[in-house]
Amino acid sequence: MTTFRELGLSDSLLQSVESMGFEEATPIQAETIPHALQGKDIIGQAQTGTGKTAAFGLPLLDKVDTHKESVQGIVIAPTRELAIQVGEELYKIGKHKRVRILPIYGGQDINRQIRALKKHPHIIVGTPGRILDHINRKTLRLQNVETVVLDEADEMLNMGFIEDIEAILTDVPETHQTLLFSATMPDPIRRIAERFMTEPQHIKVKAKEVTMPNIQQFYLEVQEKKKFDVLTRLLDIQSPELAIVFGRTKRRVDELSEALNLRGYAAEGIHGDLTQAKRMSVLRKFKEGSIEVLVATDVAARGLDISGVTHVYNFDIPQDPESYVHRIGRTGRAGKKGIAMLFVTPRESGQLKNIERTTKRKMDRMDAPTLDEALEGQQRLIAEKLQSTIENENLAYYKRIAEEMLEENDSVTVVAAALKMMTKEPDTTPIALTSEPPVVSRGGGSKKRGGNGGGYRDGNRNRSRDGRGGDGRNRDRNRDGRNRDGNRDRNREGSRDGNRGRRGEGQGRPGSSNGRGERKHHSRKPQA
């Protein structure tokens, strides 16, 4: 393992890193930082949870001259949440060097951002639309920028930000250094690299290095109409301290959060149609524990860093395997254990295989719990808590009443009454969620799998390949935000000012695409 002291970082940054409790660099950090400190362009392929923020953040901060009152580096991120998270991380790392960091993103008052820009920040972290907005207003000048970071470049492609990114890169000095990080390298991202980067060092963290040993992963085969009852039974059995439930569309998130509240769970949802103030309010309540279940879309959850998340429930299977890795990365952090559950409908077995190939890890099968099993599971959890109380607490104050009860009742009856009082009675309030179309992918079919419970998948052959219809046109209907040419649709989450009408994340008429029709997987051809 490589220590941070071996990487050639300045003393002030080492002081910050050590105060944060880090000594050894992760593989992506150990390979990236030395090249970046030499000024080389970098293409880093890494998933969430690998430490890539510090991989680009440390060399970025190391180059900053705090005596200069100008913007010297920009970090471009796909979502507001990720921009905020990266900004907070860079602030912690650059604290002892006194580097001024400013996050800018849609949904925040632009006049407030203009006032903050006049205070001469050294590094800007922002979403493409809002950065470009400030460039066009001439409230952000990039003539002194030395380093540009593209974080989660493939996600920015998916959201249609390619034109904005090209416009920003055209506005910075030709001599700047570019650090591009992306889980995958589709052709439009490769063209960006060819056009704007000079002999980049390609650093790739293999999938086996990004799977998360602290996370137990299970899948459940369940019909679409039964998913909600299965979810509530799992919540009753597992009693998570903090849980995130992922839905594929905004409509799904709204309906799920409302349905969970009807069944007695403290739940709220976040997605791109919420104002920034509302999203921050929901996240604050979740961190404080006043909300026990957070329901989120993939885009809204990007960059979330919430400690203490014990369970992740993939209510809808994600559209792509990379999103699955991002989702489950919300748990199992800082050495703690986490549990991830994936709901798979009969026609989605091919997508499950795609996820397993990407993570290089076979998931264990779990049978969907029955109502009786949910009640018994609750009782066993309560029994464990009672046993822990017996072993660890002083019960002297309670024994007199207990002895009086035992004079009139046998001990089994007393314990049974205690279990009944502490067990949540099942709520069978009727819930009708709008069905979402399955994510059908190549690789399905009838195969027997091992794991906990075994069982067969649907033996019917999948009617489409790679999500395409019989005419070969792509029908992945719920991916976030790409229009036909891979460029940004302005009526979508993450628009320039965050206030325009937004669609996307599968919102639209039931059974339709995300409002923009079928997508082609290409972007505008870069200019020579």
Swiss-Prot record:
GO terms for molecular function: ATP binding; ATP hydrolysis activity; RNA binding; RNA helicase activity; RNA strand annealing activity. Residues 214-374 form the Helicase C-terminal domain. Disulfide bonds: none annotated. ATP binds at residues 46-53. It is found in: Cytoplasm. Residues 428-528 are annotated as: Disordered. Residues 458-506 have a biased composition (Basic and acidic residues). It catalyses: ATP + H2O = ADP + phosphate + H(+). PROSITE patterns: DEAD_ATP_HELICASE, HELICASE_ATP_BIND_1, HELICASE_CTER, Q_MOTIF. Oligomerizes, may be a member of the RNA degradosome. The lineage of its organism: Bacteria, Bacillati, Bacillota, Bacilli, Bacillales. Belongs to the DEAD box helicase family. CshA subfamily. InterPro entries: DEAD/DEAH_box_helicase_dom (IPR011545), DEAD_box_RNA_helicases (IPR050547), DEAD_helicase_CshA (IPR030880), Helicase_ATP-bd (IPR014001), Helicase_C-like (IPR001650), P-loop_NTPase (IPR027417), RNA-helicase_DEAD-box_CS (IPR000629), RNA_helicase_DEAD_Q_motif (IPR014014). Its EC number is 3.6.4.13. DEAD-box RNA helicase possibly involved in RNA degradation. Unwinds dsRNA in both 5'- and 3'-directions, has RNA-dependent ATPase activity. A motif (Q motif) lies at residues 2-30. A motif (DEAD box) lies at residues 151-154. It comes from Bacillus anthracis. Pfam families: DEAD, DeaD_dimer, Helicase_C. One of its GO terms (cellular component) is ribosome. Residues 33-203 form the Helicase ATP-binding domain. GO terms for biological process: response to cold; RNA catabolic process. This is DEAD-box ATP-dependent RNA helicase CshA.
